[in-house]
Amino acid sequence: MTQLTYIRERLSDETLRLQLSTVVADQEALIPQSEGEYAELQKLGLYPTEECVPFVTKQGTPYYQLDNMAMVPKGDTGNYLRYGDFVFRQLEVLYIMGRMDSAEAHRWLRDNLFQGCRVDARKKAEYKSKFRGLERADWKVVQTDWMSYCLNLKYRCNALFRRDLAACGGRLPVEDATGTRYASNLFWGAELVEVNGRKYYFGCNVLGKLLARQRKEKVLPYSLPEDMHLFGEAILSI
């Protein structure tokens, strides 16, 4: 079986297509026409494990700070993330704010997310449910540019993130989605598979590709709609 055949067969699975439909409008567009397209941002690919640096959302694991869900240690204020006067410890907070076109939603998330020193995952789910009708109609289009913006902010604020990114060397960062069930994981990350006796990570790995580019260029390019706001104000420049 060729690699491209494997990818096409995986995407023929209706369950996977349904999962990917939550993050991309056209699942067919994810299929590469050649192995040379694996590096394109929104293309599925097979990435040899020996060329990858996997990371997961678990404190104490290697490259932990590369994950959007990673927490800056409590009290390490020099590495806290800052958007204007909003100070927070987890990049995912800023990322999911951009999903909703509502200052009320942004303030609710800011004021309700933190429970003591931990981020309450239940509040994230409540946020998406409470304000679902206010989700940006173009979210599937703008989400990767918004992620680039968020990563730029994290790179500027967090030395732990810069350290882990540099430690990857020339290898490809991969958000390891093996064994996870989140619908978007094979878009942002990739899972461990075996094809023709060789181990690969399979997925779009959009986050990993953005990180690889940021390691090289420091600042990721992005283009956001003029009507995209946070807290009722225009997005701050980075």
Predicted features and spans:
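Charged, low-complexity intrinsically disordered segments
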Residues: T2-I238
